[in-house]
Amino acid sequence: MLWLYSILLAAGLAALSPVLWLRDRRSGRYTRRGGERLGRLPRLDGEGAIWVHAVSVGEALAVERLIGELGRQFPGRPLVLSVTTAAAREVAERRITAARVFYFPLDFRFSTRRALRAIRPALVLIAETEIWPRFLREARKAGARVVFVNGRISGRSFARYRWVRPLLRGTLARVDGWLMQTETDAERARDLGADPRRVEVTGNLKFDLQPPESRALLRQLTGHFRGAGVQSVIVAGSTMEGEEEILLAAFGQLRQNFPAALLILAPRHPRRFEPVAKLLAASGLPWSRRSQIESDGIRAGGVWLLDSLGELAPLYRVADAAFVGGSLAPHGGHNLLEPAYFAAPVVFGPAMHNFAAIAEEFLAARAAFRVESGAELENILRRLLSDDRLRISAGQAARALLEAKTGATARVLAYVAPLLAAPPSGAMVAAAPPQP
């Protein structure tokens, strides 16, 4: 059945080619290092490599600590990290220095085989259950152990995978480990054809996050805050199209009562920096941008556009309130754990299905606030800026919940260590699960 899958994949890629070409005309990201997507990689020095795959920025940051621990526990093994998006590559190359970073190959036999011959992995760890049937089969044929880590199967993904379950079942049954975030994810993995003996609930790696402190940036900002007279800060992280207008309208009302407040606006995708800048220019609000901080500074009662990558997380340390983007627009929400790490009160909209279980836990612990509209957003931000007790208690509850959920990294390491000690898997020979 993989021949049919390959035909459908090729047809889909052909259909998307005009879109990718248009994007590449603007950014050059799709043809730059395009050979990597065809599996053209320099041969890796050393034996028994560990290959970690993470699609985008969120997944790459989730495995950051795991990669560091793998390097410490298995110092003789080369480490590589493959990604799918250009933004993930940029962030990973800057933050995850223990691994060589490259683009994941297209899921054709020729490209996956070529990449596997170059890397020669003993172990492949795939973050968040991204299922590429051809790669999974070729990796097992090459003798690599394959484990899904931080596994998550959303309701939408589960419905899609069930349509192609006959195609997937034989391959998925031979995966060496399914280390899932929740029992719901584990049950869905078993339903899709995973060997029940190899399915475990290990928790969410994102709870083990260690965001960069970036003290130099914070010192710089503190100086600008003092100079501008900023007294309170709202950080809106990973915003999506349609949300900036809502945030600006809410902030426009808030600044009438909090004239020394500052809104830090961080769009999710770099390609939206300029459209958001144009929106700010037309808003009538005072604003400036990160890339021009030395010339433009920061303005109290205004907006600061974070047009950079890798600097959002440490800004939550100075936040009096943190809005999680992708949740008012219907995108499923983004990471609410980074603001929680810095004890910032968390606010999000109704569309949090990508983090549904975590969002509900935060709401139950009174560590977050859910809003349904711009008016509700303005109301809760007003409460957080004016009520010190509410703001501090919500932030402390968020941090406490985060700390109570740590430990997934250690559980993943305990599972994969016996696999690395075992002989190679051989051609599609199922490995026995590690003993508890």
Put a short name on every predicted segment.
Residues 1-436:
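Nucleotide-activated sugar donor-binding and catalytic core shared by glycosyltransferases
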